[in-house]
């Protein structure tokens, strides 16, 4: 395996993925994941070379994240802003197919600024469950279940 050359995880100063909250995924010879500032990145799994970066999937903020779950030829993505996204990851970039607000974020990220104060960014860091064509998701106030089947809409 390869090791990145950067010693910082700040955006623009990293050459790989500094995955702090969620696990990156491997598809063939490629790695896709969210770094510690919300940047979705695609890497060559053989060399570690960064192929692309997208700021579109979730907020570009400290500890921003998204949970990636494979479903056939695409992925269900739940970002920390409460959106359910259907997407594909390719060697050339991120392809978003659809997005809908599934649940409201209700928890503070507790992120500290460089000056030591708490940044009040409201997030949802709960990984959903999938079963029998449904998604079950929660925040600090509710648990919801929604159908993922097209025939239900």
Task: Show where each model-derived region lies.
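Noncatalytic, solvent-exposed loop/strand surfaces
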Residues: 1-153
């Amino acid at each position: 395996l390869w090791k990145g050359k950067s010693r910082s995880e700040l955006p623009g100063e990293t050459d790989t993925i500094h995955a702090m909250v969620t696990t990156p995924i491997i598809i063939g010879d490629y790695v896709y994941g969210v770094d510690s500032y919300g940047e979705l990145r695609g890497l060559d799994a053989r060399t570690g070379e960064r192929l692309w970066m997208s700021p579109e999937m979730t907020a570009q903020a400290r500890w921003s994240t998204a949970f990636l779950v494979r479903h056939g030829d695409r992925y269900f993505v739940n970002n920390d802003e409460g959106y359910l996204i259907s997407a594909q990851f390719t060697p050339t970039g991120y392809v978003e197919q659809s997005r809908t607000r599934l649940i409201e974020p209700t928890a503070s990220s507790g992120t500290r600024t460089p000056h030591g104060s708490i940044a009040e960014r409201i997030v949802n860091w709960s990984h959903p469950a999938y079963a029998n064509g449904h998604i079950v998701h929660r925040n600090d106030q509710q648990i919801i279940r929604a159908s993922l089947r097209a025939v239900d809409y």
